[in-house]
Amino acid sequence: GDVYKRQIHKRNGKTILEHVHGAACGAWWTANLCADGTPNGYGVYEISGNTIANQYYKSTNKEADYQIRAYSATQVFGKSGSLTFGWAANAPAMNDAKCIVANVWNSDASGNWKVSLWQNGTKVCDMTRVKTYDYWAYAYHVLYYSKSVGTTWGKNLDHYYYGNLASGTPGAADFEIVAEDGMGNTYRTSKLQTDFTGF
């Protein structure tokens, strides 16, 4: 339940996609999400003959199309005067007031996933895949589960994307993140996660 990873391996000339699913019980068997920000949940596989016709991650207590969480890269999470976490302080490429970070937990390095940023109905950019932490989830586990900073529980994974708006800031902009998984599924969000409400 610590993370959700999708890794691609080559074995005997064949490409193998390995899924390490997040858990329905979350991190440490009690949290509301995994250490990498993946919501509690499970994998769904639709089989046709001897092929996987569709696959997606189903978050518990959420609709099947809940696949993305978006953040302002310059927002700092944590308690004022205490430990705080954020992308801008840790990744120079994301230190821009126009930058949005997306956690697309079911994405992988296959090249089949396309994640794009839209503003006012116009495509702004293809978002850049990046290996990083979900600092919102990191702060959540430090604050609510008393996890120590600098220990190995934090997961630096590669199912995150970032991109800059054409203008304005994420909190004020009319934006949409669109993720296409290569299996015919398209997921969207225009909601910015700013606090721990609902978790």
Which residue stretches match the model-derived regions?
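Short, small-residue-biased leader/transition segments that mark boundaries at the very start
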Residues: 3-4
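Binuclear metal-dependent phosphoesterase catalytic core
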Residues: 16-107, 111-119, 160-190
